[in-house]
C-alpha cells in the first residue's frame, strides 16, 4: 500500500480522483510478523526435513488476535541446511504473528538507530518465542550460537509495505468494492501490480 500511495502521489493528474486516492490510502492492512533467525552450534541439532507449525490453543483460527499474556498463540519453525548430506541444521527460522501496534512507538526511526529500548524489546520477544520453542523441541536453546530478529518495522522499511503487512490489504467480504484495487487505472497504459491487486 505504501508503494501504491507513493505512486499515486507522483501522479499529478485530475484523472486520479481524490476520493480514489483516499480510499486506497485508508484500506486497513493485514497482520505483520516477528521472526527469529537462529544460528546453531555445528553438528548439534539434527536436521528436520519438514516445517513445524504449532498452535498453542485448540483452534488454528484467530492466532493474530493476542495480548501480552498469550503471545505467541502460534508459530512456524523450519531448519536450514546447505549441505548435500542434511544431517545437522545450520540454522532455523522461527516466525509468529506480530501487530504493528507492538512497535508503533518506534515509528519514524531509522534502521540501526531505533535505540536500546527497541533492542531490549526485540530481545525480550525473541527469548519469549524461543522459550515456547524449547517446550516443543527440548534442548534447542543450549545449541544456539546466536540469533537475529526482525519486526514489523523491519518489513515496513525493507519492503515499503505499510505497517510491514504480510498479506497486503485486509479484504472485506461484506464490502468487497471498498477493498478492491483494480489493476487498471484511469491513466492510459498505467497498470497496477502486486499483492494488493492479486496480479503479480
List the predicted regions and their residue ranges.
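Generic beta-strand/beta-sheet core signal
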Residues: 1-2, 95-97, 193
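Mid-domain catalytic core of redox enzymes
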Residues: 2-87
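Conserved FAD/dinucleotide-binding core of flavoprotein oxidoreductases
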Residues: 6-9, 89-128
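Glycine- and acidic
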Residues: 33-34, 107-118, 191-197
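Short, flexible loop/turn elements at secondary-structure junctions
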Residues: 40-42, 98, 194-197
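Flavin-binding catalytic cores
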Residues: 43-44, 86-87, 114-153
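Short glycine/proline-enriched loop/turn "hinge" motifs that connect secondary-structure elements
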Residues: 83-89, 180-185
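A glycine-rich dinucleotide-binding beta-alpha-beta segment and adjacent secondary-structure elements
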Residues: 134-198
Amino acid at each position: 500500500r505504501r508503494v501504491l500511495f507513493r505512486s499515486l502521489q507522483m501522479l499529478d493528474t485530475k484523472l486520479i480522483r481524490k476520493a480514489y486516492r483516499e480510499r486506497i490510502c485508508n484500506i486497513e492492512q493485514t497482520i505483520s510478523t516477528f521472526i527469529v533467525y537462529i544460528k546453531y552450534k555445528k553438528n548439534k541439532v539434527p536436521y528436520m526435513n519438514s516445517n513445524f507449525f504449532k498452535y498453542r490453543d485448540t483452534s488454528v483460527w484467530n492466532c493474530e488476535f493476542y495480548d501480552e499474556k498469550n503471545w505467541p498463540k502460534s508459530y512456524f519453525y523450519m531448519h536450514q541446511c546447505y549441505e548435500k548430506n542434511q544431517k545437522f541444521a545450520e540454522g532455523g527460522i522461527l516466525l509468529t504473528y506480530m501487530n504493528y501496534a507492538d512497535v508503533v512507538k518506534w515509528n519514524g526511526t531509522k534502521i540501526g538507530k531505533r535505540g536500546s529500548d527497541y533492542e531490549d524489546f526485540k530481545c525480550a520477544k525473541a527469548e519469549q518465542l524461543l522459550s515456547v520453542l524449547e517446550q516443543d523441541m527440548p534442548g534447542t536453546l543450549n545449541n544456539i550460537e546466536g540469533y537475529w530478529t526482525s519486526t514489523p518495522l523491519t518489513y515496513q522499511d525493507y519492503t515499503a509495505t505499510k505497517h510491514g503487512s504480510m498479506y497486503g490489504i485486509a479484504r472485506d467480504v461484506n464490502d468487497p468494492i471498498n477493498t478492491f484495487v483494480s489493476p487498471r487505472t484511469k491513466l492510459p497504459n498505467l497498470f497496477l501490480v502486486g499483492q494488493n491487486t492479486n496480479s503479480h
